[in-house]
Amino acid sequence: MNALTAVQNNAVDSGQDYSGFTLIPSAQSPRLLELTFTEQTTKQFLEQVAEWPVQALEYKSFLRFRVGKILDDLCANQLQPLLLKTLLNRAEGALLINAVGIDDVAQADEMVKLATAVAHLIGRSNFDAMSGQYYARFVVKNVDNSDSYLRQPHRVMELHNDGTYVEEITDYVLMMKIDEQNMQGGNSLLLHLDDWEHLDHFFRHPLARRPMRFAAPPSKNVSKDVFHPVFDVDQQGRPVMRYIDQFVQPKDFEEGVWLSELSDAIETSKGILSVPVPVGKFLLINNLFWLHGRDRFTPHPDLRRELMRQRGYFAYATHHYQTHQ
């Protein structure tokens, strides 16, 4: 906890009954809520969207909103306002979402449809240059020769924000577990900015607002560098971040030393949450004030994990960076 903001009362009302889903605080933190669609809701949703294969959602972007409306209607139109309220609430801003009956890699297309529906109730997912679609699926195996830490299993993927090397605002990040075989470890790691004990120190540093260069490796299919500061503020003047240690390119000694100290202070924070995400579940977080990463895996020759991500902008509120749009 730092002096800039304090945890508000948990928005989860123990007396609130929702139609089509349940909502409870997670075991890891009251900031992270667990939302579970009932078996009936899941079954009805999949039946009503069965006519559209994933390719249809790729080709016709308005269908992504159509499937979102179907899901919200099945939840008596309580889902969309709940999602927005939670993700825009500084005291929370994170959900672990599950649909009863979706828990096997054979249902990968159904997983994409469900995640797409949820994401497009809060905004729109951006084009992902790595995959050429509005979402990306990628596999982590025991041996990796890629050019970033995204697929490397035997080391921690450090905490970061998404969207640091693109010009589009990235308000939310969705990360879904599609498959997992011979896996031990590899929990998702999360850190809320207001639980980072060193936030005040780094946010008030002169380099916090200096635009820095961010450049992505070839696998990201992004050739243009972008410039922005590591820190900014939201409409209420509260700190937000746009940071990843792999892609920020310090121009001089001063920036390099400061960024190294920043990285160490984040990775050693006592506020980091370790969250298991079973197959079929996904995390949905506010990317402006949550950092995310991944713990290391135990080596195994047949280790395999497949993930799906979406990241995009909120369409119903303007909680963007104030000085570097």
From Swiss-Prot:
Pathway as given in its UniProt record: Amino-acid degradation
User: Can you quote the record's cofactor note?
Assistant: Binds 1 Fe(2+) ion per subunit.
Please provide the Gene Ontology terms (biological process) for this protein. Answer: L-lysine catabolic process
Identify the EC number(s): 1.14.11.64
Q: Which domain of life is it from?
A: Bacteria
Which coenzymes or cofactors are required?
Answer: Fe(2+)
According to its UniProt record, which reaction does this protein catalyse? glutarate + 2-oxoglutarate + O2 = (S)-2-hydroxyglutarate + succinate + CO2
Q: Name one GO molecular function term.
A: glutarate dioxygenase activity
Q: Which residues bind Fe cation?
A: H160, D162, H292
Q: Which UniProt keywords apply?
A: Dioxygenase, Iron, Metal-binding, Oxidoreductase
Top EC class, one word: oxidoreductase
What subunit structure does UniProt give?
Homotetramer.
The UniProt function text for this chain reads: Acts as an alpha-ketoglutarate-dependent dioxygenase catalyzing hydroxylation of glutarate (GA) to L-2-hydroxyglutarate (L2HG). Functions in a L-lysine degradation pathway that proceeds via cadaverine, glutarate and L-2-hydroxyglutarate.
Q: Can you tell me which family this protein belongs to? A: Belongs to the glutarate hydroxylase family.
NCBIfam families per the UniProt record, alphabetical: PRK02963.1
Would you tell me the protein name for this molecule? Answer: Glutarate 2-hydroxylase
Instruction: Identify the species of origin.
Output: Escherichia coli O6:H1 (strain CFT073 / ATCC 700928 / UPEC)
